[in-house]
Every structure is written in structure tokens, then in C-alpha cells.
């Protein structure tokens, strides 16, 4: 009973950790994409002048 509970808690903690890592990666990638888009726009504006 106790061992099963410990295993369940550890598995749940592992799943939560993996999900938080995945969310962090998604947020990081989206931020980088926005920065890349801004840089491209700035480069295009500089080329126009």
C-alpha cells in the first residue's frame, strides 16, 4: 500500500517535471521566433534605406 503510493507520487512528479520542461521549451522557441522576426524586419528596413 505505502510502496504503491510512493511509486505513484514519484511517477506523478516525473510527469509534471517533463511537462514543465516541454512547456519551457515551447515558450523559449516562441520567444526566439518573435526575436528572429523582429531582426528580419529591422534588416529589411535597413536595406530599404
Curated annotation (Swiss-Prot):
It is a single-pass type II membrane protein. Its main location: virion. Keywords: Host membrane, Late protein, Membrane, Signal-anchor, Transmembrane, Transmembrane helix, Virion. This is Protein OPG059. It is found in: Virion membrane; Host membrane. Residues 1 are virion surface. May play a role in cell adhesion and is important for virus virulence in vivo, although it is not required for the virus life cycle in cell cultures. One of its GO terms (cellular component) is virion membrane. Residues 23-49 are intravirion. Belongs to the orthopoxvirus OPG059 family. The chain crosses the membrane at residues 2-22. It comes from Monkeypox virus.
